[in-house]
Amino acid sequence: MTALLALEDGRIFHGESFGAEGTTTGEVCFNTSMTGYQEILTDPSYRGQIVAMTYPEIGNYGVNDLDVESDAPQVRGFVIEELSPIVSSWRADTDLGGYLKKHGILGIQGIDTRALTRHLRTRGSMRACITTDTTDPSGAIEMARKASYEGVDFVKEVTSTEKHLWDSESRQSREWIIRRGSEEIVDADARGNVFTDLPPTTHTLAALDFGMKKNILRSLRRNGFDVTVLPATATAEEVLALGTDGVFLSNGPGDPEALDYARKTVSDLIGKKPLFGICLGHQVLALALGAKTFKLKFGHRGGNQPVKDLRTGKIAITSQNHGYAVDPASLPADVEVTHVNLNDGTVAGLRHLKHRASSVQYHPEACPGPHDAEYFFAEFAKEVAAAKTNA
């Protein structure tokens, strides 16, 4: 079946449908990762967006029930150049097209995604429409122009509905296929998926869920945190009532300026508990500290973003997924920039000079992407331990 991708500026790309049929709209963005499409599809940070992959062939290893970052796809649509005609992985449960169709997500293939990417790099991210009704291209352009993204609170669509202790039996935290030689394999299921042992929990943590990826939770647990997840709308009083040792601010979708409730909560927590934020959590922390954010021209999305630690001079290749950034000129004097993105010089990390509050504008947990920055979870554990010692 034919399909088309219509951009709000009038550009149209023709292709073939895979996945569900119908029409969808959202902000179209591109991701430069070569693999990890399943994690990308299920990352809540992509809520409200149509994702285009720059790598030319997608779908060759299918989809399985373990490598997900949430319980269902979060994207509005998926754009690729070529869908792999075969699935070659012993871990696959289904193929990519069947997975998208099951969840009602439209996909379009046969598009020159690198031409699309160049267009978005030149013109900036924009609203778009994917439709299998190719009889009215002008109507598809109009639907793209009417789509809403900026200022929309997508966090309320993906946050937890109630407070809960995550993975109380540690089963999910032990599920991990990729072995790096440092963990002891203690169990395996019938399909050969292996499970590792975990360190004992030494700290308690309240995690504000703005759209948290599962591997963030796994990473926190692997670093000794017992995590209680709270809805994004939780107040500072509700967080402090838990009596946890620290507070984590998660990733999530959309415009941070739309989250006044989260900004107030975090503002009220600064100086009372050690804080660490990732991605949207980084932006919310910056807003709570009095800074401003702005929309990037086309965002940072992929597993090859170089970041420099200004304190050590070291470079890390990081996984990133955001369309907004912190304005460094708006940061107060008692907040320092600790990391910068080497591609465009934008703020990639910050910390408060007086209080235990820090954040990074990327994903230390990867999934997908490199593991250069996963040490941040251990560093946060040290911060929490120091705060407990000095309490």
Model-inferred region functions:
Residues 241, 245-246, 251-325, 369-387:
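Cysteine-nucleophile active-site neighborhood
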Residues 313-356, 391:
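Catalytic beta-strand/loop cores that center a nucleophilic Ser/Cys/Thr
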Residues 17-18, 55, 320, 351, ...:
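Short clusters of small/polar residues that mark proteolytic maturation junctions
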Residues 106, 204, 274-276, 292, ...:
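Proline-centered loop/turn at the N-terminus of a beta-strand
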Residues 204-209, 318-319, 358-362:
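Active-site-proximal beta-strand elements of phosphoester/diester hydrolases
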Residues 1-237, 241-242, 256, 367-369, ...:
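RNA-binding accessory domains that recognize and position tRNA/RNA substrates
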